[in-house]
Amino acid sequence: GGNLLGEMQFSLHMDGDEFILDPATISLPGGNVSVKYHSVEKNPYWDYNLDIYIERLEYGGILRLFDPETTASGVIHVDTSLQSRSDNVEDVVDHLEGTVDLAVFPEDVGAQFLDLWASNLVFALLPKVDSKQKKLNCMVARFEVENGLMKSKETFLDSTEIIVRARGEIDLANRQLDLLAAPQAKMEKFLSVSTPIAVTGPFDDFTVGVARGGFVMTMIRWYYGLIYVPWKWLTGERFPPDGIETCYRAMDWDVPTEAR
């Protein structure tokens, strides 16, 4: 008790066939959330518009309201603009159109699970001389939405040594997932086990497994590693270890001076 959780300011207009919330600004200790909502009846259907904008919201304090023991923290950015036209409230999601952009910069999140997946199997299992902590730098997800179907434009996770790129679709209308995630070591290594993973099925019972052809491609990469890896060392794409600049560019944002 006694802690200020935040404040909210909003402008509300209600009529018989129209509802406008523009703007609604929620000021929290970690940042601000801006929401705009508009629905209007155009017989026989309704038009719906929703915009959500969050810039650099520190979410650690919010999580601790629900779980005081959590040490999770970080910064989240959201820029979402969605529209729908439907004659039934239950079908609004089926007709969604718009964009969803999300970027998360977590703190103190280890990336060992990514290293085992996508870096070097042998050296990941051996004791390491270098005990420098590896971390998850950021997560970026950008989707275009059409008729309730979210299609990925730019989706990836960046850690100290690994980038995981993802593509696919999220079918909101039918509540189905069809995603493919493929890891890439920032510095190619011999005996890489960067096998693509597929996530498919309904929201409440999806399956995670090796993508079709994943094992075959892994075996081919192992076989050609003696040539491929040295070549990548010489000519491969370079990614900064901290990943911050990579994530900002993926969102088409100007890179902050402190991140350069």
Regions found by a protein language model. Name each.
Residues 28, 41, 56, 104-108, ...:
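Transmembrane beta-strands of outer-membrane beta-barrel pores
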Residues 1, 99-107:
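Tryptophan-anchored aromatic micro-motifs
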Residues 24, 51-53, 103, 155, ...:
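Transmembrane beta-strands of outer-membrane beta-barrel proteins
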Residues 87-96, 126-260:
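Extended terminal
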Residues 2-11, 17, 26-36, 55-87, ...:
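Amphipathic hydrophobic-ligand
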Residues 108-117:
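Outer-membrane beta-barrel and related beta-rich outer-membrane complex signature
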Residues 69, 116-122:
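Flexible, surface-exposed loop regions and adjacent strand-edge segments
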